[in-house]
């Protein structure tokens, strides 16, 4: 019932502003107090006060709730009731929703006694106090919900043990033991679907009489609380259990939890969000220690990553072992990037930059392992060139080598360039997917899959002058040097810029771009993915935004590799209205954030990426929505809202108007 109430509130977008039924609100206090009375009041007539504050006092005196928790609940309850009363006086109606309008919230804050000062407004002080109160209430509420469950599990475990262990184990009070149906219902309310697995995991986590076992037993209510807030609590609990059964991992985990409860909270979030992350952390428990320190989670700069990669590789001989070092570094860094993403520390652009810097560093280090004897560089294209990678992105690249004064058609020169490219690709891709450092895609090279892997500068110049198509001008907008010989790369970019900008865009060029975009819309969405909710190729989604920006760039002569930054440049140059840029930006950010999150939530260890559309299966959509802090219905509604608004801009600017008018 409580879960349904909260779902209704969340569906209406009132989770933080609804002070009565929302998380951390008045009902959380009342539900928790009434639950404790129901569990313990059957055998203890001293805790049956009908008033919430009176019952809290009795429960605290009887030891059923800690003194600190009782004080937090009582203070929060008084504050929330005061807010409720003042709100209803101000609004002159029966309401429990804090106004979203700044002026109304400022007025309410002043009625409550908050005042402006040089550092913050009354409304800001009220918001801070309210959010702090809701956070405290929610934490205590959920901890109390789980305590009877743990006592029941402990009692059941004691009954199943032999007499020797039974004498050493604390007996649970008869009144605290819940029947199996009640236990299952309580667990389901917090997202735990598997009763037997939950009980087994709890026993593993808190079993034994060692100091670490006692600490885990004390932390369990809090751990279950944190896991209940993740997309998949059962998965998170399994991840904790898998760590505990490894002696070295258990010791590190308990030590970290003792020193940093914040690391414990963050670990629960990661384990309950992503199966792939959970498996990697299980095999590399030393990563647990960095989770509690924001400084440790800061993305490592590109040059420092290159240095670390090269240091790791020098410690190993042989290509396979060196490749394994790069894979290990990639996975370590992905945990940090994903943690910052899931914790809300980084936004979409910051995540894209971090993923791109990591990819650049891996390629730079890989080049040093392939014994390149002539100037050679890697040009990033597409999202890689724009430093806007997602977790699911392949790396679009071109290879450039310097053949000196040799004729670009010379067979020896061509063979030498191909040999360099093949050696590099063989090292990076490895003999199988498990030994792959990154996935490189050379589909944008001249002549596509039929063309040579690498060309020298004159070879590219000849191709651009004679055979290049309009789409290749568009693709080169995002070209950027990402690894290898920088001087050579800059010479390539200068030549590419001449090809892109020296000739004005014609109506035939625009028609060509529009035809290709229309064909992609018709042909590229896989049959098993929902076109109505496609995050990459759907109407008004990522591809629409990128193509519209690039068409405007070519027409107005505005360079730029990144979509989001270029949107701002287009506005600054008067090539795009601010409202249109906002619509495109909102859709891009929403779709990219959702796509990234679905990759983390839906990807399997060692498996391929999940689809680029919102999942169609209800349980998958629910997990994704929970990870994004919303509901399945609200997530679909938000997709429709932002993409329809963006599509209207795309229809007008990309397909509709004559750019020359």
Provide a role label for each language-model segment.
Residues 1-661:
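A nucleotide- and high-energy phosphate-metabolite-utilizing enzyme signature
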């Amino acid at each position: 019932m409580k879960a349904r109430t909260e779902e209704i509130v969340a569906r209406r977008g009132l989770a933080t502003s609804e002070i009565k039924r929302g998380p951390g609100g008045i009902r959380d206090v009342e539900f928790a107090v009434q639950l404790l009375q129901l569990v313990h009041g059957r055998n203890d007539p001293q805790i049956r006060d009908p008033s919430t504050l009176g019952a809290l006092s009795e429960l605290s005196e009887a030891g059923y709730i800690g003194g600190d928790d009782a004080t937090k609940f009582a203070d929060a309850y008084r504050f929330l009731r005061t807010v409720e009363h003042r709100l209803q006086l101000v609004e002159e109606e029966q309401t429990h929703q804090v106004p979203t309008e700044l002026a109304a919230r400022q007025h309410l804050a002043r009625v409550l006694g908050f005042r402006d000062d040089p550092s913050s407004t009354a409304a800001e002080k009220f918001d801070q106090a309210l959010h702090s109160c809701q956070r405290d209430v929610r934490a205590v509420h959920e901890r109390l919900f789980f305590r009877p469950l743990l006592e029941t599990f402990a009692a059941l475990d004691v009954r199943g043990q032999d007499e020797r262990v039974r004498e050493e184990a604390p007996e649970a009070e008869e009144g605290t033991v819940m029947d199996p149906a009640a236990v299952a219902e309580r667990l389901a309310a917090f997202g735990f679907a598997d009763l037997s697995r939950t009980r087994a995991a709890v026993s593993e986590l808190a079993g034994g009489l060692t100091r670490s076992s006692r600490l885990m037993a004390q932390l369990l209510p809090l751990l279950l609380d944190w896991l209940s807030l993740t997309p998949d609590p059962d998965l998170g609990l399994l991840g904790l259990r898998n760590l505990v059964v490894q002696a070295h991992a258990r010791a590190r985990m308990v030590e970290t939890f003792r020193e940093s409860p914040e690391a414990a909270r963050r670990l629960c979030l990661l384990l309950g969000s992503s199966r792939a992350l959970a498996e990697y952390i299980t095999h590399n428990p030393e990563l647990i220690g960095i989770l509690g320190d924001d400084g440790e989670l800061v993305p490592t700069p590109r040059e420092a990553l290159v240095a670390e990669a090269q240091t790791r590789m020098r410690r190993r001989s042989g290509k396979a072992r060196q490749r394994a070092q790069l894979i290990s570094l990639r996975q370590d860094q992905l945990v940090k990037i994903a943690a910052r993403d899931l914790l809300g520390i980084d936004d979409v652009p910051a995540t894209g930059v971090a993923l791109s810097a990591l990819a650049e560093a891996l390629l730079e280090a890989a080049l040093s392992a392939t014994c390149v004897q002539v100037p050679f560089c890697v040009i990033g294209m597409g999202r890689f060139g724009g430093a806007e990678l997602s977790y699911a992105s392949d790396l679009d690249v071109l290879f450039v080598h310097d053949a000196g004064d040799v004729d670009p058609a010379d067979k020896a020169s061509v063979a030498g360039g191909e040999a360099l490219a093949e050696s590099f690709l063989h090292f990076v891709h490895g003999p199988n997917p498990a030994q792959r450092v990154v996935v490189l895609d050379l589909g944008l090279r001249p002549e596509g899959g039929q063309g040579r892997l690498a060309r020298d500068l004159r070879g590219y110049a000849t191709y651009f002058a004679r055979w290049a198509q309009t789409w290749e001008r568009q693709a080169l907008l995002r070209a950027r040097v990402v690894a290898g010989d920088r001087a050579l790369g800059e010479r390539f970019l200068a030549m590419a810029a001449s090809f892109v900008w020296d000739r004005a865009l014609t109506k035939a060029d625009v028609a060509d771009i529009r035809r290709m975009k229309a064909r992609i819309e018709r042909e590229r969405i896989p049959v098993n993915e929902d076109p109505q909710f496609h995050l990459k190729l759907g109407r008004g989604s990522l591809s629409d935004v990128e193509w519209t920006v690039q068409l405007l760039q070519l027409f107005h002569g505005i360079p730029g590799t990144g979509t989001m930054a270029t949107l701002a440049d287009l506005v600054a140059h008067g090539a795009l209205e601010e409202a249109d840029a906002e619509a495109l930006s909102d859709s891009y950010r929403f779709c990219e954030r959702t796509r990234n999150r679905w990759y983390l939530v839906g990807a399997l260890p060692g498996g391929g990426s999940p689809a680029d559309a919102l999942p169609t299966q209800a349980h998958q959509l629910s997990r994704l929505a929970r990870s994004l802090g919303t509901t399945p219905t609200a997530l679909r509604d938000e997709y429709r809202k932002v993409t329809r608004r963006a599509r209207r801009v795309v229809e007008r600017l990309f397909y509709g108007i004559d750019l020359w008018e």
